[in-house]
Each structure stands twice: as C-alpha cells, then as structure tokens.
Amino acid sequence: MKFATLAGKFLIAVPSLADPFFERTVLYLCAHNEDGALGLVINQPLDTTMSQMAGYLELDWQRPGVDRVYMGGPVSPEQGFVLFEQALDLPGIMMLPDDLYMGTNPDIIRLMGRAGAQERFLFALGYAGWEAGQLEHELQENSWLVCDAQRSILFDMGYAQRWEAAIRSMGIDPALLVDASHGFAN
C-alpha cells in the first residue's frame, strides 16, 4: 500500500486539542513519510525580530518592515528554519511541495535581509516533529484538521487571522467547531 503524504498541507489544531502549545495553531507540514513528520507553526510570533536575529548572527538586515520571527515548534527551538518561494543556490535547501523551499543555512538570512530580496518568506525557530505513526494517530483522534496550504495565508495574512482563515478555506465556520471539553469554540 502506497503511503499518502500530507507534506505541503496545513494542519489546524481543533479547539479540543489538549496540548496548550498547539492551541489554535496552524502548521505548514514540510515533510511527512513513513518515518514521521516535520512541520512549522505559522501563527505564533515571538518577541524577537529578524533585525535582532541578524544582529546576533552578525548579519546585515536591511528590511526593517519584514521582521517577524515565529515559534516554529517545541523541538530544537534554537534552530532557525526559513520557508520561501524562490530557489536559492545554497547547500541544505529542501524543495517542498508546490514549489516552496525550506532551509536552515544562515546564508539564507543574509540573502533575505538584503533590500530587494524575496518578498515572501517565513522565519521560524524550532519545529514540530512526529515519530513514525504519531501524526496518523493524532489525526485518527481528530486532534487536527488538514487542508491544502494556501500561500496567501502562509505569507500575506496577519498571524492572528491564519487559524480562522485556514478553517474557513475548508468551508467550515470556526464558531461551529465543538470543543469537547468546553462546548462550542467561541
């Protein structure tokens, strides 16, 4: 039987998800295979900015308006991950579904920090990881909704609107999602 990957999809936390870290989160699933899965939370901003990160890494950041850093997940929170749209000729770049790319190379930050660089990218610290079969088990428990990732939600929309927008992209009114422990979501 062929494995059905969910790479390139959004995982949306349902209101009843018990883990407080993932409450009302949207994750972009970067990799998913028989060995497990890796995703980045795209709607939990940190107080740290790209300007601060670049200063710490002794890099020049020339884009003060493009500054948000996200908490990508609880695993390896010291590791930076960049999601972006245009291929870069650097080592360690991973091609994702739908012509998106991810990398951890600090040179990506150097390139993204230049004036005139790629407009749409997302920088996250840490990632969410699942061992083999763990995500599938959580899906069977209805902990997550799954939908096609949309670049407009990933790159253009404000972080506070992403959870609701991802749910609405499935044709679901978020107010109608039932939280098993507290009744309706709102």
Curated annotation (Swiss-Prot):
Gene3D superfamilies per the UniProt record, alphabetical: VC0467-like (3.40.1740.10)
Entry GO CC: cytosol
Superkingdom assignment: Bacteria
InterPro entries: AlgH-like
Alphabetical list of HAMAP family matching this protein: UPF0301
Alphabetized PANTHER family for the sequence: UNCHARACTERIZED PROTEIN YQGE, UPF0301 PROTEIN YQGE
Family: Belongs to the UPF0301 (AlgH) family.
Protein known as: UPF0301 protein Mmc1_0726
Annotated organism of origin: Magnetococcus marinus (strain ATCC BAA-1437 / JCM 17883 / MC-1)
